[in-house]
């Protein structure tokens, strides 16, 4: 458990973060309750995710690396009511259950419009080659709620050249974000790191990197930057219902 203090002239805040390490043979996953982050991921002894760290971006210091969930939306909100990628990555999650190779987290937010929503995150290492992330949106209210989530993994990539579903890309030229559709299965290769990614309800990938570290992102989303456009019916979770989003990363080589 880590304790962080934020000092200000008017107040002092203490944030307690719990870090958990999941294991399955040579696979390890470090999970952080602050933001529901995966701070690091190693499959079969290979570093799959660039470890979460602080990097300098211009005059700012920003978190990069690992993987976080984007909820209730991936990307910006045109009405500016919600922060970039929503509030999941800046919230403190509660542990629901924990075993050697899996963990369940829960978040109940006071964000306007989402007061009756319970967000469930499940991370697991089913074997030493695979990692699974599942987001379940539970709407216990009467009214439908709008969601268009995603996962934001930073894959380890020393070079800029990579391959996505057989098409070549250069990370130096995707800082604007390239959106690519890929139903269910995607095949990605970074510097010899070959991955299969299988998803559920996340058919649009955001390919992005700012190259402020040795990482490139291939992010499965529901509809990309959906909150920049008018709402559509498929983005809503009805009252007293649930919707599930999932991704499985499998190390191929």
For each predicted feature, which ranges?
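Short solvent-exposed strand-capping/beta-turn motif centered on an Asx-Ser/Thr pair
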Residues: 138-143, 252
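Extended, loop-rich substrate-binding clefts of extracytoplasmic carbohydrate-active enzymes
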Residues: 82-127
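Short, well-ordered beta-strand segments enriched in hydrophobic/aromatic residues
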Residues: 31, 123, 131-139
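Hydrophobic core residues within well-ordered beta-strands of beta-rich domains
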Residues: 119, 131-133, 243
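Acidic-aromatic substrate-binding/catalytic surfaces of carbohydrate-active enzymes
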Residues: 28-81
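Beta-strand-rich recognition/accessory modules
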Residues: 16-27, 32-34, 104-110, 186-253
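Active-site/ligand-binding surface loops and adjacent short beta/alpha elements
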Residues: 143-205, 210
């Amino acid at each position: 458990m880590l304790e962080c203090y934020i000092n200000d002239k008017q107040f002092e805040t203490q944030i307690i973060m719990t870090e958990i390490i999941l294991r399955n043979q040579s696979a390890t996953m470090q999970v952080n309750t602050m933001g529901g982050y995966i701070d690091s991921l190693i499959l079969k002894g290979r570093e799959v995710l660039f470890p979460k760290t602080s990097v300098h971006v211009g005059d700012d210091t920003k978190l990069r690396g690992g993987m976080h969930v984007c909820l209730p939306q991936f990307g910006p909100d045109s009405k500016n009511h919600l922060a970039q990628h929503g509030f999941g990555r800046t919230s403190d999650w509660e542990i629901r259950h924990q075993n050697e190779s899996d963990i369940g987290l829960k978040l109940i937010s006071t964000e306007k419009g989402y007061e009756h929503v319970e967000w469930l995150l499940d991370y697991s290492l089913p074997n030493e080659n695979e990692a699974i992330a599942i987001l379940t949106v539970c709407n216990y209210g009467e009214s439908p709620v709008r969601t268009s989530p995603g996962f934001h993994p930073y894959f380890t990539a020393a070079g800029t050249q990579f391959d996505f579903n057989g098409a070549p890309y250069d990370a130096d030229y995707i800082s604007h974000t390239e959106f690519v559709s890929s139903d269910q299965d995607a095949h990605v290769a970074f510097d010899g790191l070959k991955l299969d990614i299988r998803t559920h309800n996340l058919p649009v990938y955001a390919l992005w990197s700012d190259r402020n570290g040795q990482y490139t992102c291939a992010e499965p989303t529901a509809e990309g930057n959906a909150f920049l456009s008018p709402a559509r019916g498929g983005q809503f979770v009805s009252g007293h219902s649930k919707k599930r989003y999932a991704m499985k990363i499998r190390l191929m080589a």
